[in-house]
Amino acid sequence: MITTKRDKWIYIGSLILLAAFLILKVQRGFTVSEEEGGIWNIVQGLFVCFGLFACFNLDRSKTNNPVIKTYRGFMFTVWAMAFPVVLFTGKMGISTIFHFITIPYGFLCFLWFYSCGIKNDIRKYSYLLYPTFLVTFVILFTALRSFYFLSDEKGAVADVYYIVGLLPIIFIYTPKKLRILPFLLACIAVMMTGKRTGFLALATIFILYFLPSDPDDRKPFIYRLLALLVLLIPTYYIITRLTGSFDLNMFDRLAKLGEDGGSGRSERWKKVLHTMLYDQSMLPLLVGHGYGSAYKFIGGHVHNDFLEFFYDYGFMVLILYISLFVSLIRECIKMYKAKFTYAREFGVAVIVSVFLAMFSFYAIDCTHITCCSVCLGLILAEWYKYQNGITHE
């Protein structure tokens, strides 16, 4: 495959926009008086436009993948169901129009970077994404202490999920023997912010990514496990000192994983389920209550994408959303069976996506899904080229 200079500049420009989005979003998260909106919204709008452009310009053969077809069907079904609500509510302000346009943001961002990955080798541009990962970590690290002194609001620390979401692509850019280092940085960031969902995701990644045998690694399993534990001991010490100085009590929070911890998740989940299963007729079960209803009903996100889509759009969209993750897992299994180079990294992206969808927000909000969409799109593009014997010249 021959990549033109124009293609390369388009891809580089996209990665620069991605870097700007992540850095500005994390900075915004620690500015307590910041109003909604900003240049990151412009970047989101650009990714939507780029994704729509890719929809009409990618050959059908390149999008004939179960993940892409399922994802496309899910997001555009949601978009179509949201349209009447937005049209007939009479509230057609700029904010409403923007949120309506960005409903399929995750899919369009994924499709755009899939298109870029088809035309370019993802390893050539590591110098753009790796610094973004490090800069985002530094911003998070330096701003957290002052943030806790400025406000009692803890929501902004969820920006750590941008760091966790970038891990799959960072693993690709890191030599195998050093991949534990960005993972440890992500661990430190998650422990500092006190995000238990992030901790569970990283624990799962540790078990499924680092512990299983690598075909190229001839070291016995016990040696690999001991080496990882040796690295984790000083990391535990650093994290303990940091969380102690920030008064985060992270390990107390981990000991209470079954409790709510102040986020209101359990009460929101109970309220949504009770309303859908006991207080409704059959019609809301099938088609939901309409775009944004769950957010208005409980005064915020449900912190579970499955329940929020169920409340807003009904059982049909819930099934489509579940089928999206089923297709991702199936594709990951195919990659493992084919011994695809980036199968493990694709698995990491799926793990992060599943945990965000279950305990935070993923496709329901155009924020954390950005990094996961980039990783899934780029790796799936490499998978397409692997299956079709396509190489770059």
Question: How does the language model describe each region?
Answer:
Residues 40-49, 67-86, 90-115, 128, ...:
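Aromatic-anchored transmembrane helix interface
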Residues 221, 236-271, 293-296:
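Flexible juxtamembrane loops connecting transmembrane helices in multi-pass membrane enzymes
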Residues 48-51, 105-147, 154-213:
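Alpha-helical transmembrane segments of multi-pass inner-membrane proteins
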Residues 1-59, 78-90, 102, 138-154:
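N-terminal signal-anchor transmembrane segment
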Residues 2-3, 14-16, 168-241, 319, ...:
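Hydrophobic alpha-helical segments of polytopic membrane proteins
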Residues 7-8, 60, 315-354, 386:
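Hydrophobic transmembrane alpha-helices and their immediate junctions
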